[in-house]
Amino acid sequence: MPTKERHIAMMGYRSVGKSSLCIQFVEGQFVDSYDPTIENTFTKIERVKSQDYIVKLIDTAGQDEYSIFPVQYSMDYHGYVLVYSITSQKSFEVVKIIYEKLLDVMGKKYVPVVLVGNKIDLHQERTVSTEEGKKLAESWRAAFLETSAKQNESVGDIFHQLLILIENENGNPQEKSGCLVS
């Protein structure tokens, strides 16, 4: 099968770990320092169900509730990773606003999304429950994962699940494995 190229935008409030998730996925390392992102692009070849994908990740600048949705992220993107920190209720609220703006700008009722609760290594500081994340993802018909970029926990699963959602949206359903990651 020929390799397919898929463009994915990482979106969320500032300091939730979007860049750390990208770097962990692409380079296999965790960068501890925080340097606010303007925009970075990462590329990795990923195989899902015997299909190779060139995954282009766009690591966006952090958004807030007042951000105007960047129109360029509504064109030529196949899927979205919306990230919040389990230690920040504010980031959870902002991700809801980003999702609504995304649907509004795209003029659609559904887009392939994985909702990610990051920083589970900081579980003692948790302010957003797993149940809250699951309920929100269900209401969006999105996949949901809790991750730790620092400990590389479930990072690859984000992109694996999103690629499957994208293929299903494009009318190419993947066979089901019977395995659920939550």
UniProtKB/Swiss-Prot annotation:
Lipid anchor positions (S-farnesyl cysteine): C179
Record keywords, A-Z: Cytoplasm, Endoplasmic reticulum, Golgi apparatus, GTP-binding, Hydrolase, Lipoprotein, Magnesium, Membrane, Metal-binding, Methylation, Nucleotide-binding, Prenylation
Subcellular location, principal: membrane
Residues cleaved off as propeptide: 180-182
Membrane protein topology class: Lipid-anchor
List of residues binding GTP: S15, G17, K18, S19, S20, V31, Y34, T37, N118, D121, A149
EC number(s) per entry: 3.6.5.-
Motif (Effector region): 34-42
InterPro entries: P-loop_NTPase, Small_GTP-bd, Small_GTPase, Small_GTPase_Ras-type
Binding annotation for Mg(2+): S19, T37
GO molecular function per UniProt: GDP binding; GTP binding; GTPase activity; metal ion binding
Cell compartment(s), UniProt: Endomembrane system; Golgi apparatus membrane; Cytoplasm, Cytosol; Endoplasmic reticulum membrane
GO cellular component entries: cytosol; endoplasmic reticulum membrane; Golgi membrane; plasma membrane
Keyword Amino-acid biosynthesis: no
Top-level EC class: hydrolase
One of the GO BP terms on file: G1/S transition of mitotic cell cycle
Family: Belongs to the small GTPase superfamily. Rheb family.
Name of this protein: GTP-binding protein Rheb homolog
Provenance organism: Drosophila melanogaster (Fruit fly)
Taxonomic path: Eukaryota, Metazoa, Ecdysozoa, Arthropoda, Hexapoda
